[in-house]
Amino acid sequence: LTSLLATYRPITGENAPGLRFECVIEDFLKGKKLWLPVEMLKEKKFCAIIKCGSISAFCEKYMADLDQEKARDAVFRYLIRLRCKHDFYFFAYAYARIKNKDGGDDIPFLLNHAQIGLTKDFERQRLHGELHSILIILLKCRQWGGSTDTEVYMFWIQMFWKTNWNSNIIGHQSSSATQVFDMYEKLANAIPTWLYYEIGETFKEDSRKLRTSSTQNNIKYLIPRSCKIQTGSARNPESCRSADAAMAHITEEAFFPNTTEWTPQKVVNAAISPINVTRPYTFIVRESTPNGRENEFHDEWVRANSFDKDGNRLSIYTPYFVPWFDIEKYILPFKSEQEKIDFVLWLYKNREDEQYHGSYFWWLWEIKGATLEGIHWYVNECKKYSDLDGMRQEYPSDDVEAFLFSGTTVFDPYKLKEMEEDCK
């Protein structure tokens, strides 16, 4: 439970993911102790600032012939941009604004537990992967912000790491791709112009960050970074073609229509075929809620979870799934320590009960690693449904349940999975 509810401090970097080091710069962010990504230490100028101990001392030593106020402002901006470039969690909170699901104004993007897990996969592949490309197949069942995290991360790559790095956003309907792009547009326009440019690079103070193509309404340009963002729909496959894409986000793939002219696989291929995944910072996320087992998305998910005799994954994609018990809002705290003890005793006593699902609740604890507070919530939530299957459909505990209850089958899905593995 502690891990599930753990929070990080995005401004100071305390408890934030990734390898970090402690430092203090007296006149930067109010002189607070900071935990910064170790990758920042590769910058000689940054190391010199740390050695001086403050922005003012650095300016006096290395920029004495310049107006000191302007020099300090330039160094401050340098530090902010460098921090944003190497610390996605800081950038997301400081500059990305997302819709407040409770209503009201947009809020800073503070990643939740599930989003942190996905971002760790992104960062692991970017920093330590063999090719430094980012390739994920994302199975989602509950709304935990996977698409939001994906889009902000794609924007971050275009913003700080790559110019002329074009992206393709494909949905099963034009509205789904447009919705994703609207969030992208909001993000781009909220960021100050100077942050788009390297320190010292000249630029015009123009509030326009995005421009729509004069020939195609589904294409927009991120002007300061010379990046193209194209949206497309599986119902209009030609809109998915992009000859120079380096990144793609394919959303709700399992619901792509299957026609005589265009299969879902052809639509996906049209979107990703231009992307050379051997180049660092290329990015593909194939994401969907499940829609049974008879579709290309399910087949690719199975391949991503399968390995050859040498232990190599059969797919280029790394699978990512979030069960309900890894989403922090699905817990029910106990009123007292005694109530918790009584619940544990009840759980153990009924661990072999099939009729009232005690064996399943015990499986969540012993095999799946769900928290007691999570199982407490699950048991209580089950009372809304006439049977356990209804609950498992809404809140799957693993990918097997996710695909089972999104389609129809007359066979035990776990037995089917065992048979599939035996056939490899």
Segments predicted by a language model, with ranges:
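Phosphate/NTP-binding elements of NTP-utilizing enzymes
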Residues: 1-424
